[in-house]
Protein backbone atom coordinates (compact mmCIF):
# COMPACT_ATOMS: atom_id res chain seq x y z
CA UNK A 1 0.00 0.00 0.00
CA UNK A 2 1.41 3.35 -1.01
CA UNK A 3 1.30 6.27 1.36
CA UNK A 4 2.20 9.16 -0.90
CA UNK A 5 2.55 9.68 -4.61
CA UNK A 6 1.15 7.87 -7.62
CA UNK A 7 -2.29 6.53 -8.45
CA UNK A 8 -4.10 4.90 -5.58
CA UNK A 9 -2.04 6.74 -3.00
CA UNK A 10 -3.52 6.76 0.47
CA UNK A 11 -3.77 10.25 1.99
CA UNK A 12 -1.90 10.66 5.28
CA UNK A 13 -3.92 10.50 8.48
CA UNK A 14 -4.46 13.74 10.40
CA UNK A 15 -1.95 14.02 13.28
CA UNK A 16 -4.58 13.42 15.98
CA UNK A 17 -5.91 10.26 14.31
CA UNK A 18 -2.38 9.03 13.61
CA UNK A 19 -1.42 9.43 17.25
CA UNK A 20 -4.54 7.57 18.32
CA UNK A 21 -3.87 4.75 15.85
CA UNK A 22 -0.25 4.39 16.98
CA UNK A 23 -1.33 4.27 20.61
CA UNK A 24 -3.83 1.49 19.88
CA UNK A 25 -1.24 -0.49 17.91
CA UNK A 26 1.27 -0.02 20.71
CA UNK A 27 -1.28 -1.21 23.26
CA UNK A 28 -2.27 -4.23 21.16
CA UNK A 29 1.36 -5.33 20.84
CA UNK A 30 2.44 -4.71 24.41
CA UNK A 31 -0.72 -5.27 26.44
CA UNK A 32 -0.18 -9.02 27.04
CA UNK A 33 3.37 -8.37 28.22
CA UNK A 34 2.29 -5.35 30.21
CA UNK A 35 -0.38 -7.34 32.01
CA UNK A 36 2.18 -10.01 32.85
CA UNK A 37 4.34 -7.27 34.35
CA UNK A 38 1.38 -5.91 36.33
CA UNK A 39 1.11 -2.73 34.27
CA UNK A 40 -0.42 -0.02 36.39
CA UNK A 41 -3.86 1.41 35.73
CA UNK A 42 -2.23 4.81 35.23
CA UNK A 43 -0.09 3.48 32.38
CA UNK A 44 -3.04 1.83 30.66
CA UNK A 45 -5.15 4.94 31.17
CA UNK A 46 -2.57 6.91 29.18
CA UNK A 47 -3.48 4.82 26.12
CA UNK A 48 -7.13 5.85 26.52
CA UNK A 49 -6.19 9.51 26.65
CA UNK A 50 -4.31 9.24 23.36
CA UNK A 51 -7.70 9.10 21.62
CA UNK A 52 -9.99 10.83 24.10
CA UNK A 53 -7.67 13.73 24.99
CA UNK A 54 -5.11 14.12 27.77
CA UNK A 55 -7.33 16.75 29.38
CA UNK A 56 -10.49 14.73 28.84
CA UNK A 57 -11.45 16.81 25.80
CA UNK A 58 -11.45 14.88 22.52
CA UNK A 59 -10.03 16.50 19.41
CA UNK A 60 -10.71 13.53 17.15
CA UNK A 61 -13.91 13.51 15.04
CA UNK A 62 -16.72 11.30 16.38
CA UNK A 63 -14.64 10.38 19.45
CA UNK A 64 -16.29 11.48 22.69
CA UNK A 65 -14.79 13.69 25.35
CA UNK A 66 -14.55 11.79 28.63
CA UNK A 67 -14.08 14.70 31.03
CA UNK A 68 -16.84 15.05 33.60
CA UNK A 69 -18.53 11.74 32.83
CA UNK A 70 -20.05 10.03 35.90
CA UNK A 71 -18.03 7.04 37.12
CA UNK A 72 -21.14 4.81 37.12
CA UNK A 73 -21.74 5.57 33.44
CA UNK A 74 -18.11 4.84 32.53
CA UNK A 75 -18.17 1.47 34.33
CA UNK A 76 -21.38 0.53 32.52
CA UNK A 77 -20.00 1.43 29.10
CA UNK A 78 -16.68 -0.34 29.66
CA UNK A 79 -18.61 -3.40 30.79
CA UNK A 80 -20.68 -3.34 27.59
CA UNK A 81 -17.51 -3.04 25.49
CA UNK A 82 -15.81 -5.84 27.41
CA UNK A 83 -18.79 -8.12 26.89
CA UNK A 84 -19.06 -7.21 23.19
CA UNK A 85 -22.46 -5.58 23.62
CA UNK A 86 -21.40 -2.27 22.07
CA UNK A 87 -20.17 -2.23 18.49
CA UNK A 88 -16.83 -0.46 18.43
CA UNK A 89 -13.95 -2.79 17.48
CA UNK A 90 -11.23 -0.57 18.98
CA UNK A 91 -13.01 -0.20 22.29
CA UNK A 92 -14.03 -3.86 22.44
CA UNK A 93 -10.40 -4.85 21.90
CA UNK A 94 -9.19 -2.36 24.51
CA UNK A 95 -11.64 -3.63 27.13
CA UNK A 96 -10.87 -7.31 26.62
CA UNK A 97 -9.32 -8.88 29.70
CA UNK A 98 -10.12 -5.99 32.03
CA UNK A 99 -11.31 -7.13 35.44
CA UNK A 100 -14.19 -5.51 37.30
CA UNK A 101 -11.58 -3.80 39.48
CA UNK A 102 -9.93 -2.45 36.33
CA UNK A 103 -13.25 -1.02 35.15
CA UNK A 104 -13.75 0.73 38.47
CA UNK A 105 -10.20 2.11 38.46
CA UNK A 106 -10.62 3.49 34.94
CA UNK A 107 -14.00 5.01 35.79
CA UNK A 108 -12.62 6.74 38.87
CA UNK A 109 -9.87 8.32 36.77
CA UNK A 110 -12.31 9.47 34.09
CA UNK A 111 -14.61 11.03 36.69
CA UNK A 112 -11.68 13.17 37.92
CA UNK A 113 -11.00 14.65 34.49
CA UNK A 114 -12.31 18.21 34.08
CA UNK A 115 -15.48 18.55 32.01
CA UNK A 116 -15.03 20.02 28.54
CA UNK A 117 -15.35 23.82 28.56
CA UNK A 118 -18.09 25.62 26.65
CA UNK A 119 -17.37 26.11 22.98
CA UNK A 120 -15.47 29.24 22.03
CA UNK A 121 -17.56 29.41 18.87
CA UNK A 122 -20.97 31.02 19.08
CA UNK A 123 -23.79 28.66 18.10
CA UNK A 124 -26.16 29.13 15.21
CA UNK A 125 -29.08 30.98 16.80
CA UNK A 126 -31.85 29.13 14.93
CA UNK A 127 -30.51 25.63 15.55
CA UNK A 128 -29.62 26.50 19.16
CA UNK A 129 -33.15 27.74 19.84
CA UNK A 130 -34.80 24.73 18.19
CA UNK A 131 -32.54 22.37 20.12
CA UNK A 132 -33.30 24.09 23.42
CA UNK A 133 -37.04 23.81 22.80
CA UNK A 134 -36.67 20.09 22.14
CA UNK A 135 -34.92 19.57 25.48
CA UNK A 136 -37.81 21.33 27.19
CA UNK A 137 -40.48 19.27 25.44
CA UNK A 138 -38.69 15.98 26.16
CA UNK A 139 -37.34 14.65 29.48
CA UNK A 140 -33.68 15.22 28.57
CA UNK A 141 -33.06 17.27 31.70
CA UNK A 142 -34.89 14.82 33.94
CA UNK A 143 -32.50 11.97 33.23
CA UNK A 144 -29.32 13.89 32.41
CA UNK A 145 -29.86 16.73 34.95
CA UNK A 146 -31.18 20.19 34.05
CA UNK A 147 -27.63 21.34 33.26
CA UNK A 148 -26.97 18.12 31.29
CA UNK A 149 -24.04 17.27 33.57
CA UNK A 150 -25.14 13.63 33.79
CA UNK A 151 -25.63 11.46 36.85
CA UNK A 152 -25.15 7.82 37.77
CA UNK A 153 -25.58 5.80 34.56
CA UNK A 154 -26.71 8.84 32.55
CA UNK A 155 -23.88 10.49 30.57
CA UNK A 156 -22.87 14.11 30.58
CA UNK A 157 -24.19 15.81 27.43
CA UNK A 158 -23.18 19.42 28.02
CA UNK A 159 -20.34 20.52 25.73
CA UNK A 160 -19.81 17.04 24.34
CA UNK A 161 -18.53 16.91 20.75
CA UNK A 162 -21.37 17.82 18.40
CA UNK A 163 -20.52 15.13 15.85
CA UNK A 164 -20.41 12.45 18.54
CA UNK A 165 -23.74 13.51 20.05
CA UNK A 166 -25.37 13.35 16.63
CA UNK A 167 -23.92 9.91 15.90
CA UNK A 168 -24.98 8.58 19.30
CA UNK A 169 -28.55 9.80 18.89
CA UNK A 170 -28.79 8.41 15.38
CA UNK A 171 -27.53 5.06 16.64
CA UNK A 172 -30.02 5.02 19.51
CA UNK A 173 -32.88 5.91 17.18
CA UNK A 174 -31.98 3.22 14.64
CA UNK A 175 -31.42 0.59 17.32
CA UNK A 176 -27.74 0.24 16.42
CA UNK A 177 -26.87 1.17 19.99
CA UNK A 178 -28.58 -0.21 23.05
CA UNK A 179 -29.80 2.10 25.76
CA UNK A 180 -31.24 1.41 29.18
CA UNK A 181 -34.42 -0.54 28.63
CA UNK A 182 -35.02 1.09 25.26
CA UNK A 183 -35.76 4.50 26.82
CA UNK A 184 -33.51 6.43 24.45
CA UNK A 185 -34.86 4.71 21.35
CA UNK A 186 -38.41 5.49 22.48
CA UNK A 187 -37.66 9.14 23.21
CA UNK A 188 -35.97 9.67 19.85
CA UNK A 189 -38.43 7.66 17.77
CA UNK A 190 -40.64 10.62 16.91
CA UNK A 191 -37.83 13.04 16.14
CA UNK A 192 -36.64 13.89 12.65
CA UNK A 193 -32.99 13.87 11.68
CA UNK A 194 -33.08 17.67 11.68
CA UNK A 195 -34.32 17.50 15.27
CA UNK A 196 -31.30 15.38 16.18
CA UNK A 197 -28.99 17.85 14.42
CA UNK A 198 -30.53 20.73 16.38
CA UNK A 199 -30.29 18.84 19.68
CA UNK A 200 -26.64 18.00 19.12
CA UNK A 201 -25.90 21.63 18.26
CA UNK A 202 -27.62 22.96 21.38
CA UNK A 203 -26.06 20.46 23.79
CA UNK A 204 -22.57 20.87 22.37
CA UNK A 205 -22.87 24.65 22.81
CA UNK A 206 -24.64 24.52 26.17
CA UNK A 207 -23.93 27.64 28.20
CA UNK A 208 -22.83 29.67 25.16
CA UNK A 209 -24.97 32.60 24.06
CA UNK A 210 -25.90 32.65 20.37
CA UNK A 211 -24.36 35.44 18.33
CA UNK A 212 -26.67 38.46 18.00
CA UNK A 213 -28.39 38.77 14.67
Label each PLM-derived region with a short phrase.
Residues 56-88, 92-98, 132, 136, ...:
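Gly/Gly-Pro-rich "capping" loops immediately C-terminal to redox-active cysteine motifs
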Residues 19-30:
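Bacterial N-terminal signal peptides
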Residues 1-16:
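N-terminal secretory signal peptides that target proteins for export/translocation
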Amino acid sequence: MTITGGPGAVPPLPPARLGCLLALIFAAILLPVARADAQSADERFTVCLACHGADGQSRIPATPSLGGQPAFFVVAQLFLFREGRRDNPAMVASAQGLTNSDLTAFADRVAKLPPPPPSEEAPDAARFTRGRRLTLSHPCGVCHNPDFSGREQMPRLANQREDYLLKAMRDYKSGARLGYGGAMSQELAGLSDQDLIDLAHYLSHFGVAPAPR
